[in-house]
Amino acid sequence: MNSKLIRFLAVLIAFASCGFAFAQESDSNKNEKLILTVDDAVNYALKNNQSLKSAAIDLEIKKRANSYSWNTFLPSASLSGTLARSNDIDTIKSSIESSAAFPAFLQGAAVRNDLKDGLDAVGYVDASKIIDDMYGSEEAALWHPVGNLSFSWAFNAAMLKSISATKKQYEAGLISWEQSVRETEVNIKKMFYGILLAQENLKIQKESMRNAEARWHQAEINYRNGTVPRLSVLNSQVTYENMKPTILSAENSLKQTKETFGFLLGLPYGTKIDLTGTIETSYVDVNADELFKKYVEQNNEIKSLKKNIELIKTGIDATYLSTFTPSLAVSFGLQPTVSNITKNWFDKDNYSEGGNLTITLAYSNLFDMLPCSSNMQKLKDSKQQLAQAEIGLEQLYQNAEIEVHKLCDNLTVSRANIEAMRNNVTLAQEAYDSTLKAYNNGTQELLAVRDSESSLNQARLGLMNENYNYISAVLDLETKLNITLK
C-alpha cells in the first residue's frame, strides 16, 4: 500500500512540475517583446494585415475569371432519361391494327406460327392477343423508355468584347492591389515614425520630470543652507508633482497607439512591441517638373481611371456588336425511344431514333436599334459616362502636378527648417546648461530655469516634428508617383 502511495505521489509531483514549467514558459513568451525596425513592420503588415488579405481574395477572384474567360464559348449540354407510360391502351391497339408494316409482320409470324392465335378465321387482327404475344401483357405495352441528349451553342461578336472586359477588370484589380499595398506601406511607416516621435516626446517629458525632481532636491539643499526661502522648495516640489499626471497620460496614449499598430500588423492582441530606429532622415534632391514628366503615368489613381475608361469603351463596343450584329445559335439533339420494354433495349430493331439539328442566325430584338429604345438610351448614357471619366482624368493630371510641386516645395522648406532647428537646439542646450548652473549656485530664479528648459524642449520637439514632416512628405511624394526616392 505504501509503495502505491509513493508511486502516486511521484506521478503527481511530475505533473505539477510540468505544469509549473509550462506556466513559466507561457509567462516568458507573454513578456517577450517583439523588436521591430521599420522594414520589419512593413513586412509584418504585408503578410498579416486583414485588409490586404481581403484585397488579395478580390484579386484572386478576378485572376481566375480572367484565366477562364474563354469558357463563355463552351456549349451547353444536357442528358436525361425518361420512363413514359401511356394511359390509353386503345391508342396502342389502333396503332398496331393500322400499322403499314403489320401485314409483313403477320406474314412472317404466321409462317412461324408465333401469332396464329391473334388471327381469326378470316385473318382479321385480334390486337389484344398480338399485344400479349409481343409484350406479355397490356401493362408492358404502356411503358416506353426515352433518352434525350442535346447540345446547344450560341455566339455573338459581343462575346469577344466580354472576354476583353474580363481581362481589363483583372488588370484594374492588379492596379487596385498595388495601390492597397503602397497605401499600407506608407501608413505603417508613418505610424512607425509617429510612435518613435511619441516615444521621444515621452522621453523628453521624463527627462524634464527628473530635472524637476533634481531642482526640488537642490532647492531643499539651498534652503537648508539659507540661500533660498521655503517658498522656492514648495514651488519646485509642485512643479515636479504636476508633471506626473501628464507623463502617465502620455504613457497610456503610447501604449494604446502601439496596440493599434500591432492590430494593423496582424499581431495577436497583447503582443508587446519595441520599435527601433530614429526620426533622422537623409535628404533627397527633387525637381518637381522632372519628377512629374517622368513618373506621372505611374500614378495609381491615373492608371486606375485609364483602365476604367478602357472598360467603358469596351462596354460600348460590346453593346454595338450585340445590337447590330446577328447571333448564331446551333442546336443538336438525340432522342432514342425503346419500342418494347420487355426486350433488349440496345437492340437496334427495338428502338427508334429521333432528334434534330438546327442552325439559326437571328437578331435578338430589332427594336433595340431604334434611337428611342432603352438599349440605345443606355448606350448614350455610357458615352456620357465616358466623357465624364475623360474629364476626371484631365483633373487627375492637374491635381497630380499641383501635388508634386506642393510636396517638393514642402521638402525644400522642411529641409531648411531642419538645419535652422538643429542650430536652435544647440543654442537652447547651452542656454539651459548655463541657467541651471546659475540656479544651482543660487544666482538664478526657478522661473528662469523653467523658461530655459521649456525653450530647450520646444526646440528638440520642433526638430523631431520637422524631421517627421520631412519623412511624411517623402512618403507622400513616393506614393503620388508610385516610386522610391533615393
Question: Predicted regions: what is each one?
Answer:
Residues 29-33, 80-155, 276-283, 317, ...:
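Small/polar, glycine/serine/threonine/aspartate-rich low-complexity segments that form flexible
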Residues 2-5, 36, 175-298, 410, ...:
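Periplasmic alpha-helical coiled-coil/stalk elements that build and connect Gram-negative outer-membrane
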Residues 223-227, 439-443, 480:
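A short glycine-centered flexible hinge/capping loop motif at secondary-structure junctions
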Residues 23-90, 95, 167, 269-310, ...:
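Bacterial Sec-pathway N-terminal export signals of envelope proteins
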Residues 53-57, 70, 139, 154-181, ...:
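Sec/SRP-type N-terminal targeting helices
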Residues 4, 24-31, 85-91, 96-104, ...:
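Acidic, low-complexity, intrinsically disordered peripheral segments
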Residues 9-18:
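Bacterial N-terminal signal peptides
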